[in-house]
């Protein structure tokens, strides 16, 4: 087992990474404040791991709250289901809410914990690669609004993140690839040697090689923990973790939540960010193509939806948390391993990026 730490003063917390951690109550007990525990999961993950976690928590009063699965249910109505469960079972301020699932479950359970009786204890047990390397670390919680993704939420840190890498053995191939999008992101924004390592090990990762997965998760979490420790509330450097997300969130919102997985939209959105960085002269076309090829090898889409127009993108991108005083800030690459957030770009370069022929670009790479 490896343990990392997110350094946030009195609110610092560990990230435990290893095999079989779901069966180790000693990793959870120090972070549970009372006898009441609510496990929030979904209809896909609960049949696989809920009973196992409940056995690990023997001696606690465990309340299972099982939600429907999917991004389409990351909304007020589903959030209300969590509150209904907690109130019906008379859970008090000493309850602990545990998120057992992927990013949607983590975001909603965390937001519920932040709101319930003005804040109760919260633990993250992510079961998808995307949630293990990204959404479970850093305290971002929330739900979607019909007009924009993650527009309603709170920063609320967990007391511990428990990553059992064997949970990935039950992850569908499409979900695994979606998680790799966020892993590749770290190499692009802050760790060029890691990007090289990913190019050498992407096939092993897709083959669920435990050693390779552990390295990828550790390096991703270490990168995110460092950034979160320096900028918890995303006022500066933390925003660079959103490479590709402004374009990607526009795709998710326009296509309908859940039609494109988050990681799939991030991959296509990152290709657009690479293209814009190239058009600005910050990275070479060879560096752009390096990123595109790796996303392809990871089994991810690299072409945005053909039906989305420039106006579609601009409409959704105008409702983005990085918009300040009406000016859209974008995360772009100065070079591989160095990301910046900026609103200092010619509007015509953004427009050219939005209307670029990405299918022709990808076909050219095949040739």
UniProtKB/Swiss-Prot annotation:
Quote the subcellular location field of this record: Cytoplasm
Does the entry feature the keyword Nucleotide-binding, yes or no? yes
List the catalytic activities from the record.
Answer: 7-phospho-2-dehydro-3-deoxy-D-arabino-heptonate = 3-dehydroquinate + phosphate
Alphabetized GO MF terms: 3-dehydroquinate synthase activity; metal ion binding; nucleotide binding
Keywords linked to the UniProt accession: Amino-acid biosynthesis, Aromatic amino acid biosynthesis, Cobalt, Cytoplasm, Lyase, Metal-binding, NAD, Nucleotide-binding, Zinc
Write out the pathway annotation from the protein's UniProt entry: Metabolic intermediate biosynthesis; chorismate biosynthesis; chorismate from D-erythrose 4-phosphate and phosphoenolpyruvate: step 2/7
Q: How is the cofactor bound?
A: Binds 1 divalent metal cation per subunit. Can use either Co(2+) or Zn(2+).
Q: Name one GO cellular component term.
A: cytoplasm
EC number(s) on record?
4.2.3.4
Q: Name one GO biological process term.
A: aromatic amino acid family biosynthetic process
Q: What does the entry list as the binding residues for Zn(2+)?
A: 182, 245, 262
Instruction: Report the InterPro entries cross-referenced here.
Output: Dehydroquinate_synthase (IPR050071), DHQ_synth_AroB (IPR016037), DHQ_synth_fam (IPR030963), DHQS/DOIS_N (IPR030960), DHQS_C (IPR056179)
NAD among keywords: yes
Give cofactor(s), names only.
NAD(+); Co(2+); Zn(2+)
Annotated binding of NAD(+), by residue: 69-74, 103-107, 127-128, 140, 149
Superkingdom of this entry's organism? Answer: Bacteria
Name the Pfam families for this protein: DHQ_synthase, DHQS_C
- Functional note: Catalyzes the conversion of 3-deoxy-D-arabino-heptulosonate 7-phosphate (DAHP) to dehydroquinate (DHQ).
Write down the HAMAP family for this protein, in alphabetical order.
Answer: DHQ_synthase (MF_00110)
So what family is this one in?
Answer: Belongs to the sugar phosphate cyclases superfamily. Dehydroquinate synthase family.
> What's the name of the protein?
3-dehydroquinate synthase
The organism of origin for this protein: Pseudomonas syringae pv. tomato (strain ATCC BAA-871 / DC3000)
Q: Which gene encodes it?
A: aroB
């Amino acid at each position: 087992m490896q343990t990392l730490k997110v350094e946030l003063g009195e609110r610092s917390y560990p990230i435990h990474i290893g095999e079989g951690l779901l069966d180790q109550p000693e990793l959870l007990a120090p972070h549970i404040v009372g006898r009441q525990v609510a496990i929030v999961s979904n209809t896909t993950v609960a049949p696989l791991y809920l009973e196992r976690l409940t056995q690990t928590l023997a001696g606690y009063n465990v309340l299972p709250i099982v939600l429907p699965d999917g991004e389409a249910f990351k909304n007020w109505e589903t959030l209300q289901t969590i509150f209904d469960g907690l109130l019906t079972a008379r859970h008090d301020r000493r309850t602990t809410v545990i998120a057992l699932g992927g990013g949607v479950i983590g975001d909603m359970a965390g937001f519920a914990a932040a709101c319930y009786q003005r804040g109760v204890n919260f633990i993250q047990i992510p079961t998808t690669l995307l949630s293990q390397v990204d959404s479970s670390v850093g305290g971002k919680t929330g739900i979607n609004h019909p007009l924009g993704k993650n527009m309603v939420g709170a920063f609320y840190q967990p007391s511990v993140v428990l990553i059992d890498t064997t949970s990935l053995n039950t992850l569908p191939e499409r979900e695994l690839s979606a998680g790799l999008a966020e892993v590749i992101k770290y190499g692009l924004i802050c760790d060029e040697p890691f990007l090289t390592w990913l190019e050498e090990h992407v096939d092993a990762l897709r083959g669920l090689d435990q050693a390779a997965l552990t390295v990828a998760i550790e390096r991703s979490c270490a990168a995110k923990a460092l950034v979160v420790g320096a900028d918890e509330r995303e006022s500066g450097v933390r925003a660079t973790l959103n490479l590709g997300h402004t374009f990607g969130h526009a795709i998710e919102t326009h296509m309908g939540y859940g039609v494109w997985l988050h990681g799939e939209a991030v991959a296509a959105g990152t290709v657009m960010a690479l293209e814009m960085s190239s058009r600005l002269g910050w990275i070479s076309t060879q560096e752009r193509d390096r990123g595109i090829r790796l996303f392809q090898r990871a089994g991810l889409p690299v072409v945005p939806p053909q039906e989305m127009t420039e106006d579609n993108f601009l409409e959704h991108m105008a409702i983005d948390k990085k918009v300040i005083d009406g000016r859209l800030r974008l995360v772009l690459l100065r070079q591989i391993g160095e990301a910046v957030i900026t609103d200092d770009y010619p509007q015509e370069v953004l427009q050219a990026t939005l209307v670029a022929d990405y299918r022709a670009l990808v076909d050219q790479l095949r040739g």
